[in-house]
Structures are given as C-alpha cells and as structure tokens.
C-alpha cells in the first residue's frame, strides 16, 4: 500500500489530543490506522516523518568558512533558526573535541593550525579540499537519516560506500565521520567528508589508535566536491 504521510500526520495530531483520555486513546486504534495509511509500524512512520521534514521544512543551505562557523552556529541556535551549513576552509585545520585527551595541542599551536572546538572526545584533521555538513534543526531525530542520505548520494557519484554507526566507509576505510548533540533545543549535526587526507598531520596530531583508517574520497573515485554539494542541496528542495 502506498504511504500517505500527510494523512497519517493529521491522524496523529488527533490522537495526541487524546493523551489525557485513556479510554478514548485505547479505543483510537493508532497502530491500525497507521497500517491503513501504508505504514507497517511506528518505526517506519517516524522515519517517513523525518524524510518529510527534511524535504519540506525549507531549511536553507549556507556556505560558511570554518573560521566563522562558531559565530554563525551560535547565532543560528540563539535565533532558533534551522540551517544546513556547508563548511569549507582555506587551509588544513583541526576539529578538537573538548574531551579529547589524544590530541597533540602543542603540535597544533607550534604549526599555527586553526582549531575548531566542539563537544566530543575525538580530533579530526581536515584540509581545504574537504567538505563538512553542519545541520541545525529542531527535529532531534534527523542525524541517522542525513548520514544515510549522504551515503546514498556518494553511491550515486560512484563510491561503493556504506554507513557504519557514525561513519561512512569504503572497503572498511573511513571517508566520513559524523556526530550530533542537542543544544538549546536544537540538534547540531557535524559531518566531516574527507576528499584529501593529510596523513603527516593526522599522525602528528591524533595519537589515539586508529580503529578505522582515514582515507580521502579521491583515493577511490574522482568525485567532485561541487557535485556532492548539489546532491546535498537537493535533499532540502
């Protein structure tokens, strides 16, 4: 049966109005009504709502340089404004988690590298050839869908890749790393996409044993960053 997400959401709105009426709520038949609208269960329905939200909420796409990201992100969160930041840089830099104990900050300072601090326990070395996605949204369940959409877009561009937890891998090698957290009621998603890796600096900065070897997309496939940007923008239109 074809899914009717709009009808299902209208039904859910009625159902939510019965939350204080136990008898009416039990008699409503929420699960049966979901099936009537083409959804096998609540898991499938919630995923469909995520997809509908991502496509129909009018989330704008904005380019931002990593040096301006902290300011632009804080401003958007303070305003409660949803946005997809496409993050670029002019040089090699470091994402450093505030709980990262394996990050060589002495080397970073000695070499004058820009550091973007974030809530986390890892350090990531990025280059000017890379791209990162910074999604701010009020829908707190979107991170897994965004990772899957990104993996699908990369497959459409010729990469044999797949999602594994918070990473996207090709032949077991890590080309994308992501994470999310909630701040002031907004989901903050950060997803780093490596096109070209700087192995020398990764070795010098990241002392944590590597479970998944980082690789650049261009080592597997001649994917153009602009083509991926176009794919990402299409998710929101």
Give, region by region, the residue ranges found by the protein language model:
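Residue-level detector of family-conserved "landmark" positions at structurally sensitive sites
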Residues: 118, 163-164
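Structural motif
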Residues: 170-171
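Beta-strand scaffold of nucleotide-dependent catalytic cores
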Residues: 116, 178-179
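Long, positively charged amphipathic alpha-helical accessory segments at protein N-termini or as interdomain linkers
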Residues: 7, 14, 20-26, 32-37, ...
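N-terminal lobe of the biotin/lipoate ligase/transferase fold
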Residues: 2-141
């Amino acid at each position: 049966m074809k899914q009717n997400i709009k009808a299902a959401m209208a039904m859910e709105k009625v159902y939510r109005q019965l939350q204080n009426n136990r008898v009416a709520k039990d008699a409503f038949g929420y699960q049966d009504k979901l099936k009537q609208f083409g959804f096998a269960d609540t898991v499938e329905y919630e995923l469909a709502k995520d997809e509908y939200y991502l496509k129909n909420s009018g989330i704008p796409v904005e380019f931002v340089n990593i040096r301006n990201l902290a300011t632009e992100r804080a401003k958007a969160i303070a305003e409660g404004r949803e946005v997809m930041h496409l993050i670029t840089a002019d040089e090699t830099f470091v994402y450093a988690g505030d709980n990262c104990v394996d990050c060589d900050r002495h080397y970073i300072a000695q070499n004058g590298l820009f550091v973007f601090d974030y809530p986390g326990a890892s350090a990531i070395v990025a280059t000017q050839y890379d791209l990162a996605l910074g999604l701010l949204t009020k829908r707190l369940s979107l991170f897994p869908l965004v990772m899957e959409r990104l993996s699908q877009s990369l497959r459409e561009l010729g990469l044999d890749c797949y999602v594994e937890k918070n990473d996207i891998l090709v032949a077991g090698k890590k080309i994308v790393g992501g994470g999310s957290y909630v701040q002031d009621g907004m989901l903050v998603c950060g997803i780093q996409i490596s096109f070209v890796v700087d192995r020398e600096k990764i070795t010098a900065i990241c002392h944590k044993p590597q479970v998944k070897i980082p690789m650049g997309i261009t080592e597997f496939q001649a994917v153009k960053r602009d083509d991926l940007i176009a794919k990402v923008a299409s998710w929101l239109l």
